[in-house]
Amino acid sequence: MKKLIATLLLITLPVLSASAHYLWIETNGTGALGQAHEIRVHYGEYTYGVFEKVEGEAFPLVSKFTLWAIAPDGTKTPLSTVAKEDHYLASFTPSQKGVYTITLNNNEIDVIDYTQYDFGIFKTHYHSTAKILVGTDGDTKTANPDGIVIKQLENDGEVIKLQVLYKGEPIAKNELKVYVSDLWSKTLFTDDNGEVSFALPWNTKYIVETTTKEEIPGTYNGDDYEFIWHCATYCIKP
């Protein structure tokens, strides 16, 4: 039991530390019609080089996720995954020109008691997205009406424009972290429209993370909680 509790605590490092365990999607940012496109799901801390093992202690606790490919016309296709050493692997074949949005949702994570850290008792809700461009650019789709989501807006390729939505509405003045490898990070805040923009100084992978608390108590799997901690990530990979 003590071992299980210690592992559960890994899920919520963001509430106590600048570092954060989170789920994120990795995939190439461009695709081609009729060609299989791979998608990876990771759990850990990208900027610290932490990639949890699929069969380790931490990843199984957040592995009840669903994964979808949303086509430019809005068609949603569920994606099955295969467990690898440090990620889950999925694949699909684009059949339309435009922007494909890959979405991951996990609202099935056990309640955690952090009263000893003066944080409370809460439930975690993860949501992740990634963009695949097949020809014509545009906005990514959103598919998380019950939580927080990061939406990429159409851009010129030099400056990334994002919008953070909570239950379908823009969330203003919300903190957003941008990570790359080797411990580099940048903190930004959304404007009144929930939007934020930033340049990409390096040709590398970027992980964006933002969180919010839903101060409504409830019960999950027989355990009461005081609030829901929502975490959204977005992967930018050239």
Where are the regions a protein language model picked out?
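N-terminal soluble domains immediately following signal/targeting peptides that reside
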Residues: 21-238
